[in-house]
Amino acid sequence: MRAAVFREVGQPLSLEDIPVPRPGAHQALIKVGRCGFCATDVAMTSGVGMNFPLGAAIGHEYCGEVVELGPDVTRLKVGDIVAGMPEGGCGTCPACLAGRPFDCFDGFTMMLGGFGEYTLVDERFAVRLPAGLSLTDGALVEPIASARRGAQMAPIDKDSRILILGAGAMGGGAAYWSRLRGGRKIVTSARSAWRADLMKEMGASEYLLAHELGEKLSGALGSAPDVVFECSGAPGMLAAAIDAVAVGGTVVCIGICTSPETLLLPQASYKEVSLRFTAAYSVADFQATVDAFDRGAVEPRKLVDRIIGLDEVPDHLENMRQGKTNGNKVHVDPTIAGGDH
């Protein structure tokens, strides 16, 4: 099978012919139907912080069709279309039993491979897609579930005043879930205006440029925000979120900054800010995302800009690394030879 393999830090992925993986206990082999690119793909191949394992076929926002079952599989069957969490665990520790293999300390393993023709999923951490959902929807489950994890950490109702810093997939996901949870005053902010319409389609009531926040934020929300979601992952933005939030408010850090951050802790202390961080998601987050899509809340489809083949994966990741892309979601369809669709 063909796959994009991480061979060298900071260098293009290598397109290679590698063996089709064989499913072990509780695992299923899936034929990948779609896989999305993510800023994590850049960060974890660049030598900054934690990296993917060298020699791994990467790609973690994937979905596909179950084509083979390993021993002891009881929850999936051949022909199921599934979105799989790109992690595996021991299956028996408290974290795994809670559907959180990301926190497993006994058997955590990365289950990547979405930028390839086949990959493995752990049946305990995979969710079936209903017939009405597309492969595009399936490959959006992972990032939108990640945003849900963060959105659930903040108290949100119809009276909440919400600020979202960053207009990428995480920012769009935060707007999406804030709206679904009843939020009505939702301001998204970023440095440029070109995503304003998209963020409003995702759930934001207003879009402000970053340099306008000081002047216009209170007018847009009525007062300082009760909740701030930091979704950009850019240096300095966590401090900006703490500065913006109301006294007694909540800041949730969804974006991951890999550079050191300088915070004036007395500012957060005097305001009695609740500061939360999120990592990954649970099976419940995956299922809730699939359920929301199945109810017709499919706005995240608008995040996907184009679909490419495996041949273009190395070049596209390098363009992302060099800041040459527009930031919209690009999906990979391993069944096409190349080119845009």
Task: Give the label of every model feature segment.
Residues 154, 181, 197-274, 339-341:
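Glycine-rich cofactor phosphate-binding loops and adjacent beta1-alpha1 units
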Residues 5-22, 37-68, 83, 97-112:
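N-terminal glycine-rich cofactor-binding segment
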Residues 189-192, 231, 279-280:
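N-terminal Rossmann-fold cofactor-binding loop
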